[in-house]
Regions:
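Patatin-like phospholipase
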Residues: 189-194
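Accessory, usually C-terminal, subdomains that scaffold auxiliary metal cofactors
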Residues: 164-167
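Conserved phosphate-donor
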Residues: 99-118, 171-186
Length: 194
């Protein structure tokens, strides 16, 4: 399970994620940068939640995020990231389709993408949404969203992210500390032990 939370404030995007990894009955945390749920993809940061094999299909292609001086836009993400990701997931027969559902196929993953100026969410049905102030993907994302909506701007961004992550961890065993923080100004990971 995973939870990634992002807050956009004063021209900086702050991201935070849990480090808990669950596989069956096994619970662990991995603190190597390659295994964190926030990845550097060129000049972008991407937060990931969902099916690990499909996340790896996205994070193994940083070239999809090369903007060549162009701003990060919804159109750019749809044309250069989502279309290639969809084709790859489809060609590898990893689309999740419910038999008795008219819903479109899903990837089983959601992503938060930022270049520091803009913040986007890529949903598991490949829809792209531009976010104005904050977003969250993953397990207990509704709990995190409720916390962010109710707590508003009363705290600095990293404190809000940590409170949302802690509240979610309290409510669900799939989310847990230590937590990792990063922002687009400093671009350095910080591990927060509990």
């Amino acid at each position: 399970m995973s939870l990634v939370v992002a807050i956009k404030k004063d021209g900086v995007v702050y991201l935070g994620a849990d480090t808990r990894i669950t596989k069956g009955e096994r619970v662990a945390s991995n603190l190597t940068e390659e295994e964190l749920k926030i990845h550097r993809m060129g000049k972008c940061l991407i937060g990931t939640a969902g099916t690990v094999s499909n996340i790896q299909l996205m994070t193994s292609h940083p070239e999809w995020f090369e903007q060549n001086g162009k701003p990060l836009t919804k159109k750019f993400i749809v044309q250069n990231v989502v279309s290639k990701y969809y084709d790859l997931v489809k060609n590898m027969d990893k689309l999740e389709v419910e038999e008795q559902s008219s819903d479109s196929p899903k990837s089983g993953c959601s992503f938060l993408v930022t270049d520091g100026e803009k913040l986007f969410m890529i949903l598991d049905d490949f829809e792209v949404i531009e976010l104005s102030s904050y977003g969250q993907v993953g397990c207990t994302d509704e709990i995190a969203m409720t916390f962010l909506l109710n707590d508003g701007d009363r705290h600095e961004p990293n404190e809000m992210i940590l409170k949302a992550l802690r509240t979610s961890a309290y409510r669900n065993d799939g989310v847990g500390a230590p937590f990792v923080l990063i922002n687009t100004r400093d671009n350095k990971f910080e591990i927060v032990e509990e």
